[in-house]
Amino acid sequence: MNKGCGSGSDSCLSSMEEELHVLAVDDNLIDRKLVERILKISSCKVTTAENGLRALEYLGLGDPQQTDSLTNVMKVNLIITDYCMPGMTGFELLKKVKESSNLKEVPVVILSSENIPTRINKCLASGAQMFMQKPLKLSDVEKLKCHLLNCRS
C-alpha cells in the first residue's frame, strides 16, 4: 500500500517537509493543541481553527462576497478535522471543501474518538482521504505524509 514508507523512512518526509501546510480543525482546545504539536514536530506548517465555520472563513468559503484570491494566499495542502463539532461537523466541512472548485483536490482527513464503521464509510465515500482515530500520534502523521506523497506522484 505505502511502499517505501516504513516507520524508519525519512525519504518520504524530506520532499514534503518544506511545503506541507495543514489546517487543523477541532473544537476541543487540548485535542487541537495536541494535533498542532505533533504536526509541528513533523515539520508541518500548521494553522488551527476551533470549528468548521472558522475553517471555512480561513479557506475563503465563509463569506460569498470574498474573492478566490484569498484562497490562493492561504493555500493549505491538507485539512485534518474532528468529526464531531458543534455548529458544523467535520463531515459537513468535508462536503463544503469537496464542493469547492478551488479546494476539492485538497485532501481531508477526519479524526474521531469513536470507531463507527458507518461513519467511517460515509466520510470515505464523500471524499475523505483517510479516517483516523484519536488521539493522533506521530506515527499517524508520518504514515499520512507518505500516503500524500504517493498520491501526488
From Swiss-Prot:
One Pfam family it belongs to: Response_reg
Entry's localization field: Nucleus
Residue span, Response regulatory domain: 21-149
Keywords recorded for this protein, A-Z: Cytokinin signaling pathway, Nucleus, Phosphoprotein, Transcription, Transcription regulation, Two-component regulatory system
This protein's record includes keyword Phosphoprotein: yes
Record's comment on post-translational modification: Two-component system major event consists of a His-to-Asp phosphorelay between a sensor histidine kinase (HK) and a response regulator (RR). In plants, the His-to-Asp phosphorelay involves an additional intermediate named Histidine-containing phosphotransfer protein (HPt). This multistep phosphorelay consists of a His-Asp-His-Asp sequential transfer of a phosphate group between first a His and an Asp of the HK protein, followed by the transfer to a conserved His of the HPt protein and finally the transfer to an Asp in the receiver domain of the RR protein.
GO molecular function: phosphorelay response regulator activity
Disulfide bond entries: none
Ion transport is among the record's keywords: no
Main location (coarse class): nucleus
GO terms classed as biological process: cytokinin-activated signaling pathway; regulation of DNA-templated transcription
The family this protein is said to belong to: Belongs to the ARR family. Type-A subfamily.
Entry-linked PANTHER family: TWO-COMPONENT RESPONSE REGULATOR, TWO-COMPONENT RESPONSE REGULATOR ARR17
Protein name: Two-component response regulator ARR17
Organism: Arabidopsis thaliana (Mouse-ear cress)
